[in-house]
């Protein structure tokens, strides 16, 4: 199973798709709640599905419809989930105001960090030593796992909820998006084992909420998904931080139109040439970014598709 593509949402199902044919190859029932986020482990063995209070871990290669493990401990919607590069631990963010680190094998909570207000998303820095999360009061926090504390708190716009964060695969950039439709970009500089954050640019990307922001694996593109029924692709430029001038926005490469409702989530292919989007109109779509064309539509959800996960990395590349 070299390409794993799955979607989920409000019909309480997780669906696996044959990426090229568009055929739904497997459906897992998730009766407890809607599914908010999906994440595939780096070794492609496991799928984490984040729901209302729990994360369920499924064996991708098994036909067993039941989860291997259920991670219990959050008391609100789980909004983000990510795996350590070797799959040893997993991190989650939740509307209960906490970011938790879990041991993947046992399902035990190892650490819990408190935002003090609903947390909307979480990502792991490629150095595996820091996690970055964001919240409804407008802050982005960097948590230093060695020091076991919050090493940075950024507030790009006071009291404007930061909906999503993304960190570059090479650790060079951090981007955040908020409910005002704005994107904020920082350069990440490593100095004496500490990460410094240098503001690079900020710009208005959508007139409505941004639901997801995602850097491509090659760090040349930035995708934003929005309540305005579009996803947009921005060219990541080497912009020198210029404190005296008005920041320049990233150039807009594409506006992906054809969604009928809110676009909630997206995932890049390993070669950064394709994007899959998940939409409230029940469909997931595979886009070829060069032509801005829909290559495939995935039709099967009975309610909104709000999350997507894709892993098409070749085994040899890992």
Enumerate the language-model features and the residues they cover.
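A structural motif specific to WD40 beta-propellers
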Residues: 23-26, 66-69, 110-111, 151-152, ...
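Short loop/turn segments that connect beta-strands within beta-propeller blades
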Residues: 19-20, 60-63, 104-106, 145-148, ...
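WD40-repeat beta-propellers
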Residues: 14-17, 55-59, 99-102, 140-143, ...
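WD40/WD-repeat beta-propeller blade N-cap
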Residues: 29-35, 71-78, 113-119, 155-162, ...
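Conserved strand-to-loop turn within each blade of WD40 beta-propeller repeats
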Residues: 8-11, 49-52, 93-96, 134-137, ...
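Loop/turn segments within WD40 beta-propeller blades
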Residues: 1-2, 39-44, 82-87, 123-128, ...
């Amino acid at each position: 199973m070299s390409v794993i593509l799955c979607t989920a949402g409000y019909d309480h199902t997780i669906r696996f798709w044959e990426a090229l044919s568009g055929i739904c190859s497997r459906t897992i029932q998730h009766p407890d709640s809607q599914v908010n986020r999906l994440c595939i482990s780096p070794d492609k063995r496991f799928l984490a599905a984040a729901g209302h209070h729990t994360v369920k871990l499924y064996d991708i290669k098994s036909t067993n419809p039941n989860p291997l493990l259920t991670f219990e401990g959050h008391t609100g919607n789980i909004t983000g989930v990510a795996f350590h590069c070797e799959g040893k631990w997993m991190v989650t963010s939740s509307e209960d105001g906490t970011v938790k680190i879990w041991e993947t094998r046992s399902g035990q909570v190892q650490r819990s960090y408190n935002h003090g207000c609903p947390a909307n998303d979480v990502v792991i820095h490629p150095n595996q030593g820091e996690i970055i999360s964001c919240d409804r009061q407008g802050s982005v926090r960097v948590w230093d796992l060695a020091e076991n504390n919050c090493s940075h708190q950024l507030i790009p716009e006071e009291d404007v909820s930061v909906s999503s964060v993304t960190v570059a695969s090479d650790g060079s950039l951090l981007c955040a998006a908020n409910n005002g439709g704005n994107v904020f970009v920082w350069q990440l500089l490593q100095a004496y084992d500490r990460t410094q954050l240098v503001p690079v640019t900020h710009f208005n990307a959508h007139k409505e909420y941004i639901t997801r922001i995602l850097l491509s694996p090659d760090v040349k593109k930035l995708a934003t998904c929005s309540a305005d029924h579009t996803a947009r692709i921005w060219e990541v430029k080497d912009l020198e931080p210029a404190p005296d001038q008005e920041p320049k926005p990233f150039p807009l490469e594409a506006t992906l139109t054809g969604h009928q409702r809110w676009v909630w989530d997206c995932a890049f292919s390993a070669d950064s040439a394709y994007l899959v989007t998940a939409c409230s109109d029940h469909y997931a779509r595979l886009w070829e970014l060069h032509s801005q064309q829909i290559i495939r539509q995935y039709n099967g959800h009975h309610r909104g598709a709000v999350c997507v996960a894709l892993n098409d990395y070749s085994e040899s590349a890992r």
